[in-house]
Amino acid sequence: MSVFRDDFLWGGACAANQFEGAWDVDGKGPSVPDMCTNGSHTSPKWVTTGIRPDRLYPSHEAIDFYHHYEEDIALFVEMGFKTFRTSINWTRIFPNGWETEPNENGLEFYDRVFDCCKKHGIEPLVTISHYELPYALVEKYNGWASRELIEFYMNYCKAIFERYKDKVKYWLTFNEINCGTMPMGAILETGTIKGFEGSTADVPDNKQERFQALHHQFVASAKAVKYAHDNYPQFKMGNMICFITSYPLTCDPADVIANQQKMQITNWFCSDVQVRGEYPSYMKRWFAENGITILQQPEDADILKEGTVDFYTFSYYMSNCITTHKDTEDVGGNIVAGKKNPYLKASDWGWQIDPIGLRYTLNEIYDRYHLPMMVVENGLGAYDVKSEDGKIHDSYRIDYLRRHIEQMAEAVKDGVDLMGYTPWGCIDLVSASTGEMAKRYGFIYVNKFDDGTGDLSREKKDSFYWYKKVIASNGEKLE
């Protein structure tokens, strides 16, 4: 008998800016990803202030879900999805971000997507803002550095809440909001890159600006949650974390403290604000020691307290180690890197594979908050190569997912209230961090390549058939 609840939400996850394409179709305006070129594991993508004809912008076509959504959702149905995590592209609804009236063409597109899901019994799980800030808001306001974005965001939320009130139950206010605590978050999350053009590796890091922008996102998220609770009691509201589990590299107490502080800043800070509705005490010292002063309005404390989430969602891909000792080996990671764990193997991109860490993470989060939880991103980015028979035999991906689902089951046995699982990139899409197609996550292979070529045809990988059995058995059949 399965340990997962009978109504467990098995599914998959994607993001509008990474798979929709149609970047300037039907009134859509440019978002930050539309100004980002392609890159690779070894060569960072660029941000440009205008579209340059000598550059390739992968989000412009991506995998063209915009024109393939019925075909793609049919494949999700065949796998047995109970839920599909996707996002709404802000600039499809408000092309510049500040308009007072929404773009009807954009609203109608998501009507069609959600109707298609609901027709087949798939519950949409919708991220309101997933790394696609309107670029016009960057140019005029320097992104979330300006408090004015709170009301623009609320206008956007009100439009989509009312439009999709009978089609969407589960909402996430921001994707991986804690990326704002990291330098890369200036591009991905807060849009505090006004006037910047160059490699993503060279984005200037202004901590004061970054954390002030994050505060504005906290307030916007809380206001959206409270507005939803007051006007649409059927909604379940969340806000998603990029959870980067880390361990002390050694048993040196200095390493233990260093790791505790890293976990606080990277993971618990944003989690505490969204769940407990206030800034944690440990951040006061950190802000003081880093010369950061968060400007708040008198009403902000009440707004944060009144806008706490209903459930907790996070991404989990890997873990790393933290140390105060020098001369230790670095490894790659999701948004941030860390130190090499000698007990773990790594992916093609250097991300350390740690299934047991997922069980540990689930327990740590649940013990802290006692909220229902969903793992809304998890997966293996890998180079998929077609075999002589023309198929993708991705046993490595199956092994990765199997081992993580096994540890999810152990966490449920531990008492964790786990409500769903949506592996990332259920269909191949553009990487947010590197801007490449070669880093593939999907159960479905898309014939699209880093040079922009490909006929966009879809093909089932071995993992497609495996995940179908997993869902049909509610997580019992993992072989």
Per-range role (PLM):
Residues 82, 91-93, 131-133:
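A short acidic, glycine/proline-enriched capping/turn motif at secondary-structure boundaries
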Residues 54-68, 145-147:
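Active-site mouth loops of central-metabolism enzymes
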Residues 1-53, 77, 96-98, 107-479:
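Active-site region of glycoside hydrolase catalytic domains
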Residues 88-102:
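Glycine-rich, proline-tolerant flexible connector loops at the mouths of alpha/beta enzymes
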Residues 64, 68-89, 123, 306-312:
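Catalytic domains of carbohydrate-active enzymes, especially glycoside hydrolases
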